[in-house]
């Protein structure tokens, strides 16, 4: 029989793991599992290959017209216009002041002896003598002595007007008149053609986070973890059936921002858009400096005859003319009958003068008498007929139209002209008083010419004679005094470089140089700041359509490329379907403060407040005037007589009337002051808030200097500015606009930055005629500002390249120069100092800051970088800081 069970043996060591059993049959379907946790976001996939360029899209429909662009920058000066037609003759000038009285002329030649005067009255009868015998006819007596010269004859009638004198030789060129005042600004030139497209700008700063993208596709399964230690074998369960898929888990948290994709290729340029509307006229450019003197043109066309000028004042006496020729001898008179000779009577007492006897036989011609003194000057002759029209000159080349100058001061009197041809002999004067009968004298010889007579007064100006041949050019007049440096002109087209010479005064104009050959196309420059809208170009021809490429796989988002050049506006595309609402993004950072908004509409009147406390008693008024009261007051039956019945007595009426007039005058002045308070007129007493407010209240006011008070309050800190009506701006001028004669301090020669305020012996910052609080308010009341600086150079560079240039410091201590980023870089309007200018000659570079960041202006300091060596020099001219106002 079996024995009893033995004791339980010790537990054996663990056996080797058994081999895997065969798969069990599928177990029953398990219960639905709980929703699993959201899986982590998969790793970012490898960027796909760059897709091929897509086929060019159909042109979109035309877009709506863009907003009006800002006025373009002033284009370069246009080519000189054709010479204008000859203007209408100017109105006659005013009579000049009479010339100085001429010196007394030399004694004129003695006039010819006058004709015999009429017979005198008969004398009283003498005592009759005894009749004598008739004697024989006596022998003619010897010639008696020459009688005394007769009295001068009466002045002869004025002779006919002599022929027009030959044209005198051309007088010397008169001295150059004083420089006239600057003419008014000319009409603004046409907008220049758009400049070339600049090079692409540097990449912008990283933008803010965009709206979160849609969820990515699930990542691939991760690698298996390391195998765990083997566990104790469990009892083999029956395999369960495969359960259904669980519902998707909740949306996981947003994954981190993916790596930036590769930079995509630049898209093809869009087709040119439709022609835009014509832009507004650009701002008026600054006045250019006077150009070089042009060549002397050939004579212009013959102008129409001018209107006859008014008679000028008497000119200075001309030199005496030559003596006139002797007149022809008069006809011999008829012989008188001889009287009978009487006997010699006893000499009686001298009787009274008897009647004049009949004229005796004329004696032979006596010696020529001396020429008598000149008679008084006859009346002016009639005006001569106009001369024939001269030949037409060659047309001159078109000159540059200059600005109209004001009338210059009258020139000095010219030198006396050459003597004219002597006039013909005048008609014979009336008979002179009778001379005593002389005996026939012997023929006298021709007398010597007498001294010159006094010159006659100048007759009226004759009509213009035939135009003389063109005279040779007179010597150049001395240069006028140097005017103040004008504001910078608009950059002209760059001409050929002339030969270097020693700077001197302007010489005679040289011949016009030939146009230089067309330069090679330069490399594309960096993208500049957005320029003002230029003239709309004509649409270009569309390019050939490329072959359609196969669509490539989508690539990763590339890094934002630099902004390309602005394309022409495309046509408007079709309206797309509305997109799905995106998830709300995270709140963005606070943006920069916007520009000052326009004033809102006037709100409704508020509720009337409670009455305020009574004010303090006012000062005592001026004495009243019962005279005014007597006009204004009338009594009535209910309340008794008006106070006019109690007015003062009639004796005081005149005083009261004067007082009443003074009061009315004061009231009128107060009324005007109230008007000035409501609509300030820009005076020192009533300054406007800004120039825009001034022109808003006074539309008839023109551009000029006015007082403004931007910060309001007391008018003691009002500032005087230049108000530009066209540009709607208030311009503040520096107190020291022109800076020159600067000498470097020792130790600054090697430093690159040489600021006005530190590096020069006569150091100075640029200051302005305005308190900084007023300028702050001007900035607030404007929406953009601009200012320019002119750097005049001699052997000194101003703007060499993108790394080296002068520097401007704004009032916010920011520096603006060639290597600044684009938004801070000044605009170069003219650059003659890029390479130091022409050798030993002055040139200039003009820079402008035009910005909506009004805190940058005005400019307070300037730094030069290429000065200090021998032969180098520079000057500065700081323009006004102009704040352009908001139209509210």
Curated annotation (Swiss-Prot):
It comes from Acropora millepora. Belongs to the fibrillar collagen family. This is Collagen alpha chain. Residues 3-60, 513-571 form the Collagen-like domain. The keyword Secreted applies. Residues 59-73, 148-164, 194-203, 422-440, 460-475, 508-518 have a biased composition (Low complexity). It is found in: Secreted. One of its GO terms (molecular function) is extracellular matrix structural constituent.
């Amino acid at each position: 029989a079996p024995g009893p069970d033995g004791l339980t043996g010790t537990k054996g060591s663990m056996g080797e793991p058994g081999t895997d059993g065969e798969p069990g049959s599928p177990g029953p379907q398990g219960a639905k599992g709980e929703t699993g946790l959201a899986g982590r976001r998969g790793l970012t996939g490898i960027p796909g290959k760059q897709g091929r360029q897509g086929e060019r899209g159909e042109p979109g429909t035309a877009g709506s017209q863009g907003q009006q662009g800002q006025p373009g920058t002033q284009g370069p000066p246009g080519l000189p216009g054709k010479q204008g037609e000859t203007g209408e003759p100017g109105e006659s000038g005013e009579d000049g002041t009479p010339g100085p009285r001429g010196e007394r002329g030399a004694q004129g030649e003695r006039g010819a002896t006058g004709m015999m005067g009429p017979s005198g009255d008969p004398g009283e009868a003498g005592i009759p003598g005894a009749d004598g015998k008739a004697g024989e006819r006596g022998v003619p007596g010897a010639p008696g002595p020459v009688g005394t010269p007769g009295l001068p004859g009466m002045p002869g009638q004025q002779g006919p007007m002599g022929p027009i004198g030959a044209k005198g030789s051309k007088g010397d060129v008169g001295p150059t008149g004083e420089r006239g005042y600057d003419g008014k600004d000319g009409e603004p030139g046409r907008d220049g053609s758009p400049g070339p497209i600049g090079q692409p700008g540097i990449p912008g700063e990283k933008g803010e986070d965009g709206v979160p993208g849609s969820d990515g596709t699930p990542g691939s399964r991760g690698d298996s973890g390391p195998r765990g230690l083997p566990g104790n074998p469990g009892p083999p369960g029956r395999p369960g059936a495969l359960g259904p898929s669980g519902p998707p888990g909740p949306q996981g948290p947003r994954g981190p921002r993916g790596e930036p994709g590769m930079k995509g290729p630049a898209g093809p340029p869009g087709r040119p858009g439709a022609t835009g509307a014509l832009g507004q006229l650009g701002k008026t450019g600054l006045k250019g400096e006077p150009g070089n003197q042009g060549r002397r043109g050939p004579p212009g066309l013959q102008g129409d005859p001018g209107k006859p000028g008014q008679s000028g004042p008497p000119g200075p006496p001309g030199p005496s003319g030559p003596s006139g020729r002797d007149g022809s001898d008069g006809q011999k008179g008829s012989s008188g009958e001889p009287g009978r000779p009487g006997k010699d009577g006893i000499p009686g007492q001298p009787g009274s003068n008897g009647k004049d006897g009949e004229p005796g036989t004329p004696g032979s011609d006596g010696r020529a008498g001396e020429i008598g003194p000149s008679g008084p000057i006859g009346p002016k002759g009639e005006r001569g007929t106009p001369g024939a029209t001269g030949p037409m000159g060659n047309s001159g080349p078109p000159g540059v139209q200059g600005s109209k100058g004001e009338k210059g001061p009258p020139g000095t009197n010219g030198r006396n002209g050459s003597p004219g041809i002597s006039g013909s002999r005048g008609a014979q004067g009336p008979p002179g008083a009778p001379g005593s009968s002389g005996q026939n004298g012997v023929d006298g010889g021709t007398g010597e010419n007498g001294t010159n007579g006094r010159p006659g007064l100048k007759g009226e100006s004759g009509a213009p004679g035939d135009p003389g041949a063109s005279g040779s050019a007179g010597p150049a007049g001395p240069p006028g005094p140097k005017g103040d440096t004008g504001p910078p002109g608009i950059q002209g087209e760059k001409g050929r470089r002339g030969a270097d010479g020693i700077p001197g005064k302007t010489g005679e104009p040289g011949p016009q140089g030939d146009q230089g050959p067309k330069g090679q196309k330069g490399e594309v420059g960096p993208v500049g700041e957005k320029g003002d809208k230029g003239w709309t170009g004509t649409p270009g021809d569309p390019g050939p359509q490329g072959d359609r490429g196969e669509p490539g796989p989508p690539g990763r988002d590339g890094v934002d490329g630099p902004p390309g050049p602005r394309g022409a506006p495309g046509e408007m595309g079709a309206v797309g379907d509305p997109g799905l609402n995106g998830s709300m993004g995270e709140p963005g950072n606070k943006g920069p403060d916007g520009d000052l908004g326009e004033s809102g509409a006037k709100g409704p009147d508020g509720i009337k407040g409670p009455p305020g406390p009574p004010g303090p008693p006012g000062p005592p008024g001026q004495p009243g005037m019962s005279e005014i009261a007597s006009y204004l007051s009338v009594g009535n039956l209910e309340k008794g007589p008006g106070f006019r019945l109690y007015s003062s007595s009639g004796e005081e009426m005149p005083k009261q009337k004067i007082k009443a007039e003074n009061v009315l005058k004061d009231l009128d002045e107060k009324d005007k002051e109230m008007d000035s308070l409501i609509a300030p007129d820009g005076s020192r007493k009533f300054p406007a808030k800004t120039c825009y407010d001034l022109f808003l209240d006074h539309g008839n006011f023109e551009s000029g200097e006015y007082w403004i008070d931007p910060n309001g309050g007391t008018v003691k800190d009002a500032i005087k500015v230049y108000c530009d009506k066209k540009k709607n701006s208030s311009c503040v001028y520096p107190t020291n606009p022109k800076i020159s004669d600067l000498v470097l301090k020792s130790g600054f020669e090697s430093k690159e930055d040489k600021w006005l305020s530190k590096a020069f012996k006569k150091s100075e910052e640029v200051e302005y005629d305005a308190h900084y609080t007023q300028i702050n308010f001007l900035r607030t009341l404007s929406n953009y500002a601009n200012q320019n600086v002119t750097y005049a150079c001699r052997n000194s560079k101003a703007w060499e390249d993108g790394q080296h240039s002068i520097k401007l410091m704004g009032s916010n201590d920011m520096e603006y120069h060639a290597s600044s980023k684009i938004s801070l870089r000044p605009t170069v309007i003219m650059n003659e100092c890029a390479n130091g200018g022409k050798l030993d000659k002055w040139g200039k570079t003009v820079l402008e800051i035009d910005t909506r960041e009004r805190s940058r202006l005005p400019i307070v300091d300037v730094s030069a970088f290429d000065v200090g060596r021998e032969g180098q020099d520079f000057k500065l001219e700081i323009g006004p800081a102009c704040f352009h106002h908001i139209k509210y």
